[in-house]
Regions:
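C-terminal and inter-domain tail/linker signature
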Residues: 2-167
Length: 167
């Protein structure tokens, strides 16, 4: 079969389409893996008292909008910082452990548990020295690998029960 000078070989076109499809899939997988790595680094930073105060909030964009945190705090990055500092003070050894990470587009949903020891004031509770372990879920929205929105749900009833119930 002869082809004219500018005519495209159908086999070459098919191969180019396959390559472009592969590149697109690889790019999508790469960006999903990048977000997974960002979230893992976020948890590692949150869990490390030696670096968290200097690095944790770098994962969040200045335009951050938060949901599911105490209503008396602003729903922006400053309000979020206030709440996290309160957590770190009340539970200096607090750790977050992600059990599931689900990613779609620019959103990451994490199912996790928090664990720690109550060593400082938390809401109306004086330090009890008690250990706690509570479940939670968070949805992050990203732009340029920075978190721009965060929805949070933590089992605060269980936390309160664990801190106040007498053994």
């Amino acid at each position: 079969m002869t082809y004219l000078k500018n005519q495209i070989d159908p086999d070459e076109t098919l191969m180019e389409e396959k390559v472009l499809k592969y590149i697109k899939q690889f790019s999508i997988m790469s960006s999903l893996e990048q977000l997974r790595e960002v979230v893992r680094n976020l948890a590692d930073t949150f869990n490390n008292p030696n670096v968290r105060e200097s690095s944790y909030f770098d994962f969040y964009d200045d335009s951050l909008n938060i949901h599911g945190f105490p209503p008396n705090l602003p729903s922006n990055k400053e309000g979020f910082k206030q709440f996290i500092y309160l957590l770190w003070k009340a539970f200096p050894d607090i750790r977050i452990i992600f059990e599931d990470i689900i990613i779609e587009g620019n959103k990451v949903v994490c199912r996790y548990y928090l664990t720690g020891t109550h060593k400082g004031d938390f809401e109306d509770l004086q330090p009890t020295g008690r250990l706690f372990n509570v479940n939670g879920m968070t949805e992050f929205s990203f732009r340029n690998e920075k978190i721009i929105e965060r929805w949070n749900l933590v089992d605060m009833v269980s936390l309160r029960e664990q801190l106040t119930t007498h053994a």
